[in-house]
């Protein structure tokens, strides 16, 4: 049975942990870490099988585990990812925006080759990545329009220097237009989907991102358009926001859980 360590005990990390702790999950959660010891302790109290709480993030990768699941932040990825691979552990990353820093991506890619380990990036809050992977060499353009309630965008770095006041928005309003590379730094907790599209497709500087704040929606909606020699693809995903963290879609959490199940299973695998 696979042994899993969890980095990040917030809303997403908690729900991943609860899934692993269920009777039908083919793995064991053995270690957890969060910057907040209270968050780590609170999580363990919800579990039947109590994982060990480690004292710092770098201790996770030195434990007798198979994979570290990151559900914390882009900074956590930058701080810990390399040591996980160097300690010959696999890694699943939810804060995918960190990988749009080309130096980090290249270092981690080289480390995976050197240490024969794998980094897993769940498809998160969008669908259609299998199709995009299949036509990657023929892609010419790709764009994503993300629509969320203003409260789901609060706290984003973008609004520190913007004149836009989210509390004053009364109708659907475009708050950002630009590249995925810029978007993941300005909206680090909101737009991991753009990072995934960039890594799957034609890169972060060629992936167009539009972010819309709509006080009349109760969904996190992603509309994706891609075109090239293969033809065109258009798909729209309307996600229910996580009840504890509206910045995150329920689908992103379910995607992480399913990716872990696939990692821990040796049965028939579906998809590209």
From Swiss-Prot:
Pfam families, alphabetized: Asp_DH_C, NAD_binding_3
Gene Ontology process terms (BP): NAD biosynthetic process
The reaction(s) this protein catalyses: L-aspartate + NADP(+) + H2O = oxaloacetate + NH4(+) + NADPH + H(+); L-aspartate + NAD(+) + H2O = oxaloacetate + NH4(+) + NADH + H(+)
Molecular function as annotated in GO: aspartate dehydrogenase activity; NAD binding; NADP binding; oxidoreductase activity, acting on the CH-NH2 group of donors, NAD or NADP as acceptor
Keywords of the record: NAD, NADP, Oxidoreductase, Pyridine nucleotide biosynthesis
Keyword Coiled coil attributed: no
Xref: Gene3D superfamilies: Dihydrodipicolinate Reductase, domain 2 (3.30.360.10), NAD(P)-binding Rossmann-like Domain (3.40.50.720)
Pathway where this protein functions: Cofactor biosynthesis; NAD(+) biosynthesis; iminoaspartate from L-aspartate (dehydrogenase route): step 1/1
InterPro entries: Asp/hSer_DH_NAD-bd, Asp_DH, Asp_DH_arc, Asp_DH_prok, L-Asp_DH, NAD(P)-bd_dom_sf
Active site: 222
Database matches in PANTHER family: ASPARTATE DEHYDROGENASE DOMAIN-CONTAINING PROTEIN (PTHR31873:SF6), L-ASPARTATE DEHYDROGENASE-RELATED (PTHR31873)
Note: The iminoaspartate product is unstable in aqueous solution and can decompose to oxaloacetate and ammonia.
Protein's job: Specifically catalyzes the NAD or NADP-dependent dehydrogenation of L-aspartate to iminoaspartate.
Family to which the UniProt record says this protein belongs: Belongs to the L-aspartate dehydrogenase family.
Protein name listed in UniProt: L-aspartate dehydrogenase
